[in-house]
A protein has these predicted regions:
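N-terminal propeptides
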Residues: 1-214, 218, 222
């Protein structure tokens, strides 16, 4: 509860700081703002956005931009997930969520390789799965089909990376943020299925903050 409240306060501070920025800066930082509010980025990560996006970080962002963002703290530890992911890994709960929902997969040797970097086409595939698309049924072959579909949905907006290039943490955050305003596999704006409002092509941060505040208020206080 304390961690969630601190995340809420951080999100409020970030949102307030946006009020004094020019419109162009607000737009470019909307993804980071929303990801921070939802717990997809730590304060440290938000200050190191030029670092390469890793698979562990991608799992955390995917979970933050999903309906499972509020359930991770209640899952607890369930033993070793992969040969290189212990239960006490900071990414363990997010990796488990991402794999169980089919957004990501491990490797045939029993590893997950959480520190491996993520390319544009890999991130696009993850985002498409998050949106409920069956990537195996897309017309064409990998990665052309995935990149084409991602472009059609607007997932690659404001991302200048090309096929085969490793994404930065900022680019990965932007790509998954773009998924919020895209149409999911059922033809709905994805953000609306999470209870968020969309205005002028961006997620209304006030609806995100309201969601977080309601969660905080509804949580019972633990006895000391």
């Amino acid at each position: 509860m304390k961690k969630r409240f601190l995340a809420f306060l951080l999100a409020v501070c970030v949102a307030v700081s946006m009020l004094v920025l020019p419109a162009s800066a607000v737009g470019s930082n909307a993804a980071v703002q929303t990801a921070t509010a939802l717990g997809g980025l730590t304060a440290e990560q938000a200050g190191s956005l030029g670092a390469p996006l890793t698979r562990g970080q991608a799992a955390r962002l995917l979970t933050a931009f999903s309906a499972y963002r509020d359930t991770t703290t209640a899952q607890g530890r369930t033993g070793r997930l992969y040969s290189d992911v212990d239960s006490d890994s900071p990414y363990a709960v997010y990796i488990r969520t991402a794999v169980q929902n089919g957004w990501m997969t491990g490797y045939s040797d029993g590893s997950f390789r959480p520190d491996n970097t993520v390319t544009l086409e890999e991130a696009c595939t993850m985002a498409l799965r998050l949106l409920g698309y069956d990537v195996a049924k897309l017309g064409g072959t990998f990665p052309t089909a995935q990149l084409s579909k991602a472009s059609a949905l607007g997932l690659r907006n404001e991302i200048n990376a090309r096929q085969g290039e490793t994404l930065t943490l900022e680019q990965g955050t932007m790509l998954f943020y773009n998924a919020l305003t895209a149409m999911n596999g059922s033809g709905q704006v994805y953000a609306s299925t999470l209870g968020f409002a969309v205005s002028n092509g961006q997620v209304d941060i006030s609806s995100v903050l309201l969601d977080l505040s309601l969660i905080h208020i509804s949580e019972p206080t633990r006895p000391r």
